[in-house]
């Protein structure tokens, strides 16, 4: 039986997985252990930990109600990380996938869980050297978390599109805006969670999967959105790690604003038909970004993802004003209206330099604010 630890509605937090690169050719390097040794010599109080391979490090914010306070915390965490990285002559970068690393070169970080994942999934574990942003939104009850997860599912293409930053993979332009999610698709428990409508039903599903020996904990579900009962949150897991912390925080502000809308509109109920077009819309966002198509399965209309995002921003304007997220949404709006995305920026950088090493150098400079 999973217990949902109720939390304050609309509180939020983010996790960011970061690339660790050398400063010679800007390939990934096994630097997480050394970074953590230096970082942990200071009494910082931040949540900084290793990830599945040694060329990754994860930072997680504390719980926030205001996106500006979240940005201040991430800025301080970035300063701490940069100081440690400089001592080791390492670089740190955002981006959903390193442009030219090869999965077979990666080494699993030595924890019991990561060893088990590696034994179970084989080479997929090393291919999981991709970098995402996870956004948590607090919910008062498990029932509300299940409802919110389903209501947000229709907007998953928005989060994919606005964070997309993985056009290159293993030295190749994939033609995708976000190639990262294709790595996650290979896991058997990826995609979307089943259409259960309350916490008791979700518990029954989890107990059944557990009794069949398929899962041992919620960590075994790699869904795009999932409840996080120990935190009392809904977790959005589709975002590539943006190139800057400012965009990461703006995305969290957008998630908070959408969630407030759904908390206020309790008469809106989850619709199972949302999932008829879920995989199609998700693919369109990964492949084409703002130019992708989005089909509404309820009324059968089709629009561009760009137009759907901008219409949603308009719908949320009053709520954003009330919540204090207008500035966050305006940052996203300006990028969209200008046709800007991190994926396009990375491609433009490659067109200018002709060197993926130089692309990583530039994206590292962006994240490290240099």
UniProtKB/Swiss-Prot annotation:
GO terms for biological process: modified amino acid biosynthetic process. GO terms for molecular function: ATP binding; glutamate-cysteine ligase activity. It holds the Pfam family GCS2. It catalyses: L-cysteine + L-glutamate + ATP = gamma-L-glutamyl-L-cysteine + ADP + phosphate + H(+). It comes from the Bacteria. Keywords: ATP-binding, Ligase, Nucleotide-binding. SUPFAM superfamilies: Glutamine synthetase/guanido kinase (SSF55931). It is an enzyme of class 6 (ligase). InterPro entries: GCL_type2/YbdK_subfam, GCS2, Gln_synth/guanido_kin_cat_dom, YbdK. Its EC number is 6.3.2.2. ATP-dependent carboxylate-amine ligase which exhibits weak glutamate--cysteine ligase activity. Belongs to the glutamate--cysteine ligase type 2 family. YbdK subfamily. This is Putative glutamate--cysteine ligase 2. It comes from Janthinobacterium sp. (strain Marseille).
């Amino acid at each position: 039986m999973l217990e949902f630890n109720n939390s304050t509605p609309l509180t939020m937090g983010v996790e960011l997985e970061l690339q660790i690169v050398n400063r010679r050719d800007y390939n990934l390097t096994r630097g997480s252990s050394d970074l953590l040794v230096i970082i942990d010599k200071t009494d910082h109080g931040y949540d900084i930990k290793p990830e599945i391979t040694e060329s990754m490090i994860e930072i997680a914010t504390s719980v926030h109600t205001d996106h500006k306070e979240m940005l201040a915390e991430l800025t301080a965490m970035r300063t701490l990380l940069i100081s440690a990285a400089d001592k080791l002559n390492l670089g740190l970068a955002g981006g959903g996938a390193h442009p030219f690393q090869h999965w077979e070169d990666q080494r699993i970080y030595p924890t019991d869980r990561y060893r088990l994942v590696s034994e179970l999934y084989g080479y997929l574990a090393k291919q999981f050297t991709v970098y995402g942003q996870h956004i948590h939104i607090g919910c008062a009850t498990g029932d509300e978390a299940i409802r919110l997860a389903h209501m947000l599912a229709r907007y998953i293409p928005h989060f994919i599109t606005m964070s997309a930053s993985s056009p290159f993979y293993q030295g190749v332009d994939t033609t995708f805006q976000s190639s990262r999610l294709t790595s996650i698709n290979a896991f058997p428990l990826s995609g979307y969670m089943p259409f259960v409508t309350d916490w008791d039903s979700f518990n029954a599903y989890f107990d059944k999967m557990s009794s069949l020996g398929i899962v041992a904990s919620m960590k075994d579900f790699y869904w795009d959105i999932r409840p996080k009962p120990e935190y009392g949150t809904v977790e959005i897991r589709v975002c590539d790690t943006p190139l800057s912390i400012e965009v990461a925080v703006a995305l969290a502000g957008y998630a908070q604003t959408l969630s407030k809308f759904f908390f206020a509109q309790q008469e809106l109920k989850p619709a199972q038909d949302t999932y008829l077009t879920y995989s199609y819309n998700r693919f369109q966002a990964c492949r084409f970004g703002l130019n992708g198509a989005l089909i509404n399965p309820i009324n059968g209309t089709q629009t561009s993802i760009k137009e759907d995002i901008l219409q949603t921003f308009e719908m949320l304007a009053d709520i954003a004003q009330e919540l204090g997220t207008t500035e966050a949404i305006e940052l996203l709006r300006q990028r969209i209206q200008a046709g800007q995305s991190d994926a396009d920026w990375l491609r433009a950088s490659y067109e200018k330099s002709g060197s993926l090493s130089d692309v990583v150098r530039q994206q590292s400079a962006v994240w490290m604010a240099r």
